């Protein structure tokens, strides 16, 4: 990696800002293109490719700060560095760790020099509006040697007799802004690659999908807490660690004899006596009255007799 030093001179700081901004654009674009081509053309799953593209849509406050991000990435990459691993995620994450760490220090130095120049800028000087400063998308299409000239022409069009110290201050602010936007893209890619090493590419893909679903759901219809990658991977670890293995072969379920269910009938109401059910019906002619039972003709003897 290049050892970049911030010069104390204002003109040197402006020139170095142009160099670092353009160099950062190329260093971020090359691994980004290599990652997309490598993943899409070879073996990367289509769901993982979509999740990698959806990382750019996540809010800025979702990702940790650059200092914390670099420290966490180094802790995750340390075992792979010891074993000299050449995995895809290891190589790309290592590249972004060095890139982000060096250029973040350079960008902070540019901000410090820009703040120091405020003391020598005349108080009546009007700051350059944001519309006159080169943006990140425009800087990608401008060649390296023409970046300073394009920015200078915009400052002159705003105010021809603009003070030299204020011009250098505007240059530094524009280049630092370009660096920050490039670093934002780089830190999102770094977060993706080193988390794939920690949790697995499939788990990170599932986590991004659930998180985007939670964010797109209205607040009144979603849960209070956002999904976490630890909660997604915890059931898998518990199921693998707590499963008990039984000895012997288990009999297939299809070969077991089926047990016939015994139907039970419930009779509601008064139960008829068996004597009535067994009594044969008496013959009867058509039109004749119903026969009376023999007990109705003869009265039972009185207990007194």
Curated annotation (Swiss-Prot):
Identify the SUPFAM superfamilies for this entry. Hepatitis B viral capsid (hbcag)
Q: Mainly localized where?
A: secreted
Keywords for the protein's UniProt record, in alphabetical order = Host-virus interaction, Secreted, Signal, Viral immunoevasion
Q: Which family does it belong to?
A: Belongs to the avihepadnavirus precore antigen family.
Q: What does this protein do?
A: May regulate immune response to the intracellular capsid in acting as a T-cell tolerogen, by having an immunoregulatory effect which prevents destruction of infected cells by cytotoxic T-cells.
Entry GO terms, CC: extracellular region
- Subunit structure and binding partners: Homodimerizes.
What is the protein named? External core antigen
Organism, as annotated: Duck hepatitis B virus (strain Germany/DHBV-3)
């Amino acid at each position: 990696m290049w050892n970049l030093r911030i010069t104390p001179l204002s003109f040197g700081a402006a020139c170095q800002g142009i160099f670092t901004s353009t160099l950062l654009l190329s260093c971020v674009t090359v691994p980004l293109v290599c990652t997309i081509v490598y993943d899409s053309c070879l073996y990367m799953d289509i769901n993982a490719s979509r999740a990698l593209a959806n990382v750019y849509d996540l809010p800025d406050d979702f990702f940790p700060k650059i200092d914390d991000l670099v420290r966490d990435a180094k802790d995750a990459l340390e075992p792979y560095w010891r074993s000299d691993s050449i995995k895809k995620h290891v190589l790309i994450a290592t590249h972004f760790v060095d890139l982000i760490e060096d250029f973040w220090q350079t960008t902070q130095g540019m901000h410090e020099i820009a703040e120091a120049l405020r003391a020598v800028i005349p108080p009546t000087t009007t700051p350059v509006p944001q519309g006159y400063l080169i943006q990140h998308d425009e800087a990608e299409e401008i060649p390296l040697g023409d970046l300073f000239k394009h920015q200078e022409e915009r400052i002159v069009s705003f105010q021809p007799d603009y003070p030299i110290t204020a011009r250098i201050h505007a240059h530094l602010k524009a280049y630092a802004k370009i660096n920050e936007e490039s670093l934002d893209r780089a830190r999102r890619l770094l977060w993706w690659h080193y988390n794939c090493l920690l949790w697995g590419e499939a788990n990170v893909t599932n986590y991004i999908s659930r998180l985007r679903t939670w964010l797109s759901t209205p607040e009144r219809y979603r849960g209070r807490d956002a999904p976490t990658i630890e909660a997604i991977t915890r059931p898998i670890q518990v199921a693998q660690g707590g499963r008990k293995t039984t000895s012997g072969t288990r009999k297939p379920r299809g070969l077991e004899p089926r047990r016939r269910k015994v139907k039970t009938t419930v009779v509601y109401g008064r139960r008829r006596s068996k004597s009535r059910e067994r009594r044969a019906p008496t013959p009867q002619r058509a039109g004749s009255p119903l026969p009376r039972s023999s007990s109705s003709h003869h009265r039972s003897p009185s207990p007194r007799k």
